[in-house]
């Protein structure tokens, strides 16, 4: 399928909107009340630091809502204002934050149900309004909605769209797209739908398995068993790993994405030599600026002396999880929570350790002077961070 031609056709449809409805001023007050925080503004102005009695809070210097998320949420609010009576759907969560999605439900925005990992569009009717979330939607979903005669409001982050353009270039040149991402993440599903031949690698370990196979060190059967659910239909590692381009899910850990890119460049250089390298490998630059800024700020924060770290964001938020990984890699007590209510008045905290289920830790905040580092994912409003800090202050006073 010519996905580029389909996008161009869709963008010219009078039932498609990706620029909003000119109602920014009308929804500004609602957005400010729901998501912004004067306390967080004051902490920023005070060098990202707050001291209250024995408690010191250190905020990362880049955290919370990124531009793409702000844009998506604002467009969703504008959509409800522009279509006050119509049924409005979202193909998934608008962003990976429970409080934001709850606010949209309160505005009578409907969410497409998912059964067994498959979205059920049977309830969507001609004339309904459907919002595509910040991390995009697959080509197949867009086709279905367009053919059904829906009004499509596309809030896809421009950085995600940039990745789609990258994999389309790979496809045009008959290159396989190596996508650094989580195979079931909505953004990676969308990106792979725009690619031709593709292979998704989760991390550097999986990338090394692919590199080894390229250099003749792997076993075909075990390779296909490992990647059977992470590749395009009909993928043949003996045929489809000769010409590679690298792209990524925009919320992955920047340093790992860069290392994976360097690994495949070295691998193709080793196999084909410097003269033919450009015929077998395409360089890339699809790392989101906002993701990079938040990760860099987190690295700076963990270089300070903090007694513990609180990382705030949805449990299905990839960029939040990677912020947590940074703290854990430095041996810092770190707690990933999705809402302020996870911090309890009895000084316990319900949190999600990396790769584990929710657990409760007692005696969360230690006695005596304590410095708490705080960051939040790109889908977390300042108002949520404020409520977390308020709970920490209350605990420190007990």
From Swiss-Prot:
Q: Give the Enzyme Commission number.
A: 1.17.7.4
Tell me which UniProt keywords the record has, alphabetically: 4Fe-4S, Iron, Iron-sulfur, Isoprene biosynthesis, Metal-binding, Oxidoreductase
Pfam families membership? LYTB
Q: Which GO terms describe its molecular function?
A: 4 iron, 4 sulfur cluster binding; 4-hydroxy-3-methylbut-2-enyl diphosphate reductase activity; metal ion binding
Q: Binding positions for [4Fe-4S] cluster?
A: 66, 157, 288
- Binding-site residues, dimethylallyl diphosphate: 96, 185, 317-319, 379
Name the catalytic site residues: 187 (proton donor)
Chain sites annotated for binding (2E)-4-hydroxy-3-methylbut-2-enyl diphosphate = 96, 185, 250, 317-319, 379
Is Zinc-finger one of the keywords?
no
Enzymatic reactions: isopentenyl diphosphate + 2 oxidized [2Fe-2S]-[ferredoxin] + H2O = (2E)-4-hydroxy-3-methylbut-2-enyl diphosphate + 2 reduced [2Fe-2S]-[ferredoxin] + 2 H(+); dimethylallyl diphosphate + 2 oxidized [2Fe-2S]-[ferredoxin] + H2O = (2E)-4-hydroxy-3-methylbut-2-enyl diphosphate + 2 reduced [2Fe-2S]-[ferredoxin] + 2 H(+)
Q: Which cofactor does it need?
A: [4Fe-4S] cluster
For whether the record's keyword set contains Transmembrane helix, the answer is no
Query: How are cofactors bound according to the entry's free-text note?
Result: Binds 1 [4Fe-4S] cluster per subunit.
NCBIfam families per record? ispH_lytB, PRK13371.1
Similarity comment = Belongs to the IspH family.
Name this polypeptide is given: 4-hydroxy-3-methylbut-2-enyl diphosphate reductase
């Amino acid at each position: 399928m010519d996905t580029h031609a389909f996008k161009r056709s869709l963008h010219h449809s009078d039932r498609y909107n990706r620029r909003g409805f000119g109602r920014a001023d009308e929804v500004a007050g609602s957005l400010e009340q729901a998501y912004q925080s004067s306390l967080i503004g004051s902490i920023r102005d005070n060098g990202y630091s707050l001291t209250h009695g024995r408690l010191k809070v250190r905020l990362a210097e880049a955290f919370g809502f990124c531009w793409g998320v702000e844009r998506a949420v604002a467009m969703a609010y504008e959509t409800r204002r522009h279509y006050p009576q119509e049924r409005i759907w979202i193909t998934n969560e608008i962003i990976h934050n429970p409080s934001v999605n709850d606010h949209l439900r309160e505005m009578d925005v409907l969410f497409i149900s998912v059964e067994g990992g498959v979205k059920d569009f049977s309830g969507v009717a001609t004339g309904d309004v459907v919002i595509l979330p910040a991390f995009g939607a697959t080509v197949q979903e867009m086709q279905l909605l367009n053919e059904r005669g829906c009004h499509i409001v596309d809030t896809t982050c421009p950085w995600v769209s940039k990745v789609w353009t990258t994999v389309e270039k790979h496809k045009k040149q008959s290159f396989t797209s190596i996508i650094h991402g989580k195979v079931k993440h909505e953004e990676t599903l969308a990106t792979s739908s725009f690619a031709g031949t593709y292979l998704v690698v989760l991390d550097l370990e999986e990338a090394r398995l692919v590199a080894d196979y390229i250099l003749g060190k792997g076993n075909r059967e075990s390779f296909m068993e490992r990647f059977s659910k992470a590749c395009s239909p009909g993928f043949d590692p003996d045929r489809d790993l000769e010409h590679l381009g690298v792209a990524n899910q925009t919320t992955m850990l920047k340093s790992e994405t860069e290392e994976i890119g360097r690994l495949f460049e070295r691998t193709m250089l080793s196999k084909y030599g410097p003269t033919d390298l450009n015929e077998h490998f395409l360089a890339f630059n699809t790392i989101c600026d906002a993701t990079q800024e938040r990760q860099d700020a987190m690295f700076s924060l963990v270089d300070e002396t903090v007694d513990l770290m609180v990382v705030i964001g949805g449990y299905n938020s990839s960029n939040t999880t990677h912020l947590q990984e940074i703290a854990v890699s430095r041996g810092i007590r770190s707690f990933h929570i999705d809402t302020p209510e996870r911090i309890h008045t009895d000084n316990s905290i319900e949190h999600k350790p990396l790769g584990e289920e929710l657990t409760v830790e007692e005696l969360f905040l230690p006695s005596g002077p304590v410095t708490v580092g705080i960051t939040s994912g790109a889908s977390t409003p300042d108002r949520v961070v404020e409520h977390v800090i308020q709970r920490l202050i209350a605990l420190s006073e007990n």
